[in-house]
């Protein structure tokens, strides 16, 4: 997700090319939330202008959790069908509304049907620990991959159901080490596994790297370097049906490759894309053209009012000295969370946090309602 870096495709490309990235498969669902199909098209158009390959998966879920959130625009089967006609669209982005798939929501099923009719890949997102009948139903709906696994059993379960297991190392998610043992210890066929990032903040890209960071981490976790590279290159190309164009250094494929002095440490000495040297010794050599973004798309935060300190005060019922609060429990370096309850003090009618409990607010920014939750 390019937007997680708070960057445009051009600036994201400029950040990752020196780290050896020559192809990306992206899902711009954040821009879809804000600008709908037109925003996705602008992101896609800028992506297609870059000196490396940036392919787009059409976002599937805007909103991702219908009934629980509001978005500036909504995506449906009509938008998906339209996007499938664009050059460079490789499939449907992660199907986050997994309850909708499990319960045969017509909208979700139609989006996947439009994608499969175009002979393209349906991305998965099964963020539930239940690997029983609901999981089987989700896979039967059409999702062909998933990156929400956090344990070895998750990776094995996905591969057993015919999916490709995407193991991620992003800025906040560290799920490779806990899953790669499915290959290194259990001996599953590495062709069914893909290394990915999911979300990377710009600081991670600058200071730590991109896919080179993920490959190095996999090697550090005991993976054979060649298999780690396989899971970051040809496996991905095969998954998206592009192995005849890229993913290997072979005749007829795009001349995308890196030059490195060590396959174990993977220093990126030079980067070639489409036969041209685009980076050398950490320095970007290629130009990354920018799309001419209209002024209107730069002014999409519509709060409807000026925010005041009192908007973020949590009031308690009169007479209470403490209150039982619902708290989101963070699991370090994982996407799943825990549903917790804490007794928090009330002072002068206001709930106070203590210890490592923090306030959390949601400000509606699309429709100018002024709502702060």
Language-model regions: role of each:
Residues 1-3, 29-31, 59-64, 94-98, ...:
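Active-site beta-loop-alpha junctions enriched in small/polar residues
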Residues 1-13:
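Di-metal (Zn2+ and/or Mg2+/Mn2+) metal-binding site signature of metallo-dependent hydrolases
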Residues 206-222, 226-373:
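Active-site microenvironment of metallo-dependent hydrolases
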Residues 10-121, 185-188:
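Divalent-metal coordination cores built from histidine and acidic residues
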Residues 57-59, 196, 361-363:
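Short beta-strand segments
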Residues 20, 43, 92, 158, ...:
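Divalent metal-coordination and catalytic microenvironments
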Residues 5-7, 27, 57, 125, ...:
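Structural motif
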Residues 74-94, 100-167, 174-195, 206-227, ...:
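Histidine/acidic residue-rich metal-binding segments in metalloenzymes
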């Amino acid at each position: 997700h390019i937007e997680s870096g708070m960057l445009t495709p051009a600036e994201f490309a400029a950040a990752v090319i020196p780290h050896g990235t020559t192809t990306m498969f992206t899902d711009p669902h954040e821009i879809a939330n804000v600008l709908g199909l037109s925003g996705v098209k602008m992101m896609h158009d800028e992506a297609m202008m870059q000196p490396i390959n940036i392919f787009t998966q059409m976002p599937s879920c805007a909103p991702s959790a219908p009934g629980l959130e509001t978005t500036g625009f909504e995506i449906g089967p009509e938008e998906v069908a339209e996007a499938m006609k664009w050059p460079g669209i490789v499939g449907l982005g992660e199907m986050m509304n997994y309850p909708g798939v499990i319960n045969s929501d017509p909208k979700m099923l139609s989006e996947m049907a439009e994608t499969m009719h175009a002979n393209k890949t349906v991305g998965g997102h099964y963020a539930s620990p239940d690997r029983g009948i609901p999981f089987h139903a989700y896979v039967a709906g059409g999702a062909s991959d998933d990156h929400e696994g956090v344990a070895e059993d998750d990776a094995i379960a996905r591969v057993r159901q015919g999916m490709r297991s995407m193991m991620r190392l992003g800025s906040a998610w560290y799920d490779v080490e806990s899953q790669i043992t499915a290959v290194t210890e259990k001996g599953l066929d590495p062709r069914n596994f893909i290394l990915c990032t999911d979300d990377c903040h710009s600081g991670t890209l600058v200071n730590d790297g991109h896919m080179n960071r993920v490959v190095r981490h996999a090697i550090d976790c005991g993976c054979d370097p060649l298999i780690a590279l396989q899971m970051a290159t040809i496996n991905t190309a095969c998954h998206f049906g592009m192995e005849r164009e890229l993913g290997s250094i072979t005749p007829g494929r795009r001349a995308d490759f890196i030059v490195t002095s060590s396959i174990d440490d993977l220093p990126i000495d030079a980067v070639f894309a489409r036969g041209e040297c685009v980076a050398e010794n950490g320095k970007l050599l290629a130009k990354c053209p920018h799309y001419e973004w209209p002024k209107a798309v730069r002014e999409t935060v519509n709060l409807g009012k000026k925010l005041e300190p009192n908007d973020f005060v949590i009031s308690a019922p009169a007479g209470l000295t403490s209150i039982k609060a619902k708290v989101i429990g963070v699991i370090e370096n994982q996407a799943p969370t825990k549903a917790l309850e804490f007794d928090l003090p009330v002072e002068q009618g206001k709930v106070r946090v203590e210890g490592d409990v923090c306030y959390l607010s949601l400000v509606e920014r699309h429709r100018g309602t002024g709502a702060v939750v």
